[in-house]
Amino acid sequence: KRYREKAAMMTTAVNVPLRQITRYDLNIASGIIHSAKENEITSIITGLHHKANITDSFFGVLAGHLLKRLNCELIISKFLIPVHTLKRIVVAVPPKAEYESGFPRWMEHFCRMGSTLGCRVHFFANEKTTAHLQTLIKKKHKQVLTDFSLLEDWNDLLVLTGQVSYDHLLVIISARPGTLSYDSSFEKLPRQLSK
């Protein structure tokens, strides 16, 4: 309840409507899954699981269940500083992400966030995806301060760590197996991110 109230305060502060839902279920994952389906929820935001021991997965059991059983946007976050102190948002975008149905939605999220915070949104993507990003931003998000850099090889994701400072938000766009922009290198993401 405390976290729900805190989330409501945060969304109100940035003019994002939030409808609070209370549900009792067998476990947290099934409660979220059933609520998402019943209420046609399109986006779920959850914190990054705290790895308690060596056998725990990087994303944890909850995120694993949500990824397997839901087909909606899942934002797994770990903020080390207050959001309002961010100076830049660095977004790594995989090839062919522009062909995914969620492309405009996450673009909207990060452009709105950059605009609200008054910080730059720096996209790293290949040439084709960058062209789609630029077109969408010119159409719908002209006011957002943006930068674009080439990220030719998704395996070079660790190169981005040199671009990220303590007051930056690193966003890595990923896709589920079987989708157009899915790449087998996504399986390495948890290991790369934990470094």
Language model segments and positions:
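Short, well-ordered alpha-helical microsegments
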Residues: 29, 130, 157-158
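Well-ordered alpha-helical segments embedded in enzymatic catalytic cores
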Residues: 6, 31, 105-109
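Intrinsically disordered or low-complexity boundary/linker segments at protein termini
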Residues: 1, 15, 37, 42-128, ...
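Charged docking surfaces used in two-component/phosphorelay signaling
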Residues: 23-30
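Inter-domain helical "communication" segments and dimerization helices
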Residues: 6-14, 140
